[in-house]
């Protein structure tokens, strides 16, 4: 099976569009506070930031964003991380 990333994921004759985003949640209530689409960041760049296991090469699983990841994401996104108030993660959804 051949995997490719273009505007979607091509699997055989089927194309599944996916969207990656940074989501953040209030620490006090765990309520979703915001989302930012990050589809402009190359998949290889995201892999180097989050180092997924071999079973998740396409970053389908959510990944926590801590200080280290925030610093590496900073050149790519316009978001001020406030770790005292929010938790952050990279998410992937079918679009």
Please annotate each region the language model reported.
Residues 1-2, 58:
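Short intrinsically disordered, low-complexity coil segments enriched in acidic
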Residues 2-15:
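Short, Lys/Arg-enriched N-terminal segments with co-localized hydrophobic residues
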Residues 7-9, 34, 38, 68, ...:
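Intrinsic disorder/low-complexity signal
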Residues 16-18, 86:
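Short, basic and Ser/Thr-rich N-terminal targeting/leader segments
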Residues 20-25:
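A short beta-strand micro-motif
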Residues 31-56:
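Short, flexible N-terminal segments of the mature chain
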Residues 49-95:
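Acidic, low-complexity intrinsically disordered segments
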């Amino acid at each position: 099976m051949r995997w490719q990333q273009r505007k979607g994921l091509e699997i055989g004759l089927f194309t599944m569009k996916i969207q990656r985003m940074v989501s953040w949640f209030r620490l006090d209530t765990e309520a979703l506070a915001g989302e930012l689409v990050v589809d402009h960041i190359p998949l290889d760049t995201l892999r180097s930031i989050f180092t997924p296991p071999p079973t998740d090469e396409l970053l389908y699983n959510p990944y926590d964003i801590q200080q280290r990841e925030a610093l590496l994401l900073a050149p790519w996104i316009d978001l001020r991380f406030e770790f005292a108030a929010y938790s952050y993660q990279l998410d992937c959804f079918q679009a």
